[in-house]
Each structure stands twice: as structure tokens, then as C-alpha cells.
């Protein structure tokens, strides 16, 4: 069987059973559980500080009606960061490189924000489809364009996360393969390539965290329009 660079994105199976469910559930074990002690350890304290700062930054532009989403959005943020970071380890599988998973997260959450807007303030929600002061001949065209842009939002959420992580993983694999092949032929070039690989890995770690933040931030912006 001919191997491909895209084989790393295939869902692994064991005895015919897809292991993507294990890849989605096991990362929760890595999160520390708070204890009943007055003083927690450094890891729990750092985790609490991060969640507190992120929640404040996320909910700052939202009114009180959107604050009930704090637990959901914060949990989603930590979940995506964990999956993205664990996928950078060797011989691991990154579930967030699958468009089906990302669309499964993006579509229901986006649809929930739209339903909330239609239920709480239907006039304002429908008003987003037609900007104020639009000339009468352009009204049908603008309504169609705004409707299309509304339905493209979940697709943009899922494709953005998938494309960024897939591109980073492919670059890492290409440069790592080049360094491995060049080592016996041109050791100096191979060492320089390995340095580039190390720097790219650091960049991919930042991308893994930033993309999770962008995913949740865009959801909060969609929520802001409808609460």
C-alpha cells in the first residue's frame, strides 16, 4: 500500500472499531480536578486563573443574557486546545483535522445563536439581513447576499479550524521527512532543516491555541448579535 502524507489524518481503527471516540474522551482525564484544600497546587491555580481571564475577556462585550453561555464556551475552548495540542505529539491523531467533527461543533452552536435571536428579538435578528438606508432596487439582492453570508458562517468556522491545523501538520511532516532524508547525505543542511522544524513546531503550538480561541471568539460574536 502506498503511503501518503494525508494518511496521518485518517481515523485510526483497532479491530475494525474507530478510535476517534477514544481520542475525544481521553483528553478530559488530563485536566486536574479541584480539591477541597484551601490552597491548591500550581497547576490547578494556573488553570483557574486562565479560565477566569478567558471568561472575562469573552463575556465582556456580551450583555447579561449571554453570560449563561460562559460554561459552554469555556469548556469548548479548553477542549479544542487540548485536542490541538495533543495532536502535535508524535504518533497521535488530531480529531480537529476532520471537517466532520468541526462542522459537528460549529453548526449546532451557530444554529443555537440564530434560534435565540429569532426567539428573543425577531425584528432585530431579521433586520441584520437588510442594512438601514438601502436603496429599494438593491433590497432583494442584499437580502440574498446577507442570507448567504449568514449560512456560510458555520462553514467558515469548521473549514478555518480544519485548514489551519491540516496545513501545519503537513508542513511539519514535509520538513521532518526532508531532515531525515538529508541527514546521511548533507548533515549540515539536515541540522539547519531540523532547526526550522523546531521553530515551526513552536509556531504550530501557538496556532493550535490561537485557532481554538478564534473558534470560540467568533461564536461569542455571533451570540452578541442575537442576545
From Swiss-Prot:
TM stretches of this protein: 12-32, 69-89, 98-118, 132-152, 180-200, 202-222
Protein name: ATP synthase F(0) complex subunit a
CDD domains assigned to the protein according to its UniProt record, in alphabetical order: ATP-synt_Fo_a_6
SUPFAM superfamilies: F1F0 ATP synthase subunit A
Reported function: Subunit a, of the mitochondrial membrane ATP synthase complex (F(1)F(0) ATP synthase or Complex V) that produces ATP from ADP in the presence of a proton gradient across the membrane which is generated by electron transport complexes of the respiratory chain. ATP synthase complex consist of a soluble F(1) head domain - the catalytic core - and a membrane F(1) domain - the membrane proton channel. These two domains are linked by a central stalk rotating inside the F(1) region and a stationary peripheral stalk.
Topological relation to the membrane, as annotated: Multi-pass membrane protein
GO terms under biological process: proton motive force-driven ATP synthesis; proton transmembrane transport
Molecular-function GO terms, alphabetical: proton channel activity; proton-transporting ATP synthase activity, rotational mechanism
Gene3D superfamilies: ATP synthase, F0 complex, subunit A (1.20.120.220)
Subunit structure: Component of the ATP synthase complex composed at least of ATP5F1A/subunit alpha, ATP5F1B/subunit beta, ATP5MC1/subunit c (homooctomer), MT-ATP6/subunit a, MT-ATP8/subunit 8, ATP5ME/subunit e, ATP5MF/subunit f, ATP5MG/subunit g, ATP5MK/subunit k, ATP5MJ/subunit j, ATP5F1C/subunit gamma, ATP5F1D/subunit delta, ATP5F1E/subunit epsilon, ATP5PF/subunit F6, ATP5PB/subunit b, ATP5PD/subunit d, ATP5PO/subunit OSCP.
Reaction(s) the record says it catalyses: H(+)(in) = H(+)(out)
Family to which this protein belongs: Belongs to the ATPase A chain family.
A Pfam family that the UniProt record links to this protein: ATP-synt_A
Protein's cellular compartments: Mitochondrion inner membrane
Keywords: ATP synthesis, CF(0), Hydrogen ion transport, Ion transport, Membrane, Mitochondrion, Mitochondrion inner membrane, Transmembrane, Transmembrane helix, Transport
UniProt GO cellular component terms: mitochondrial inner membrane; proton-transporting ATP synthase complex
Domain of life: Eukaryota
UniProt gene name: mt-atp6
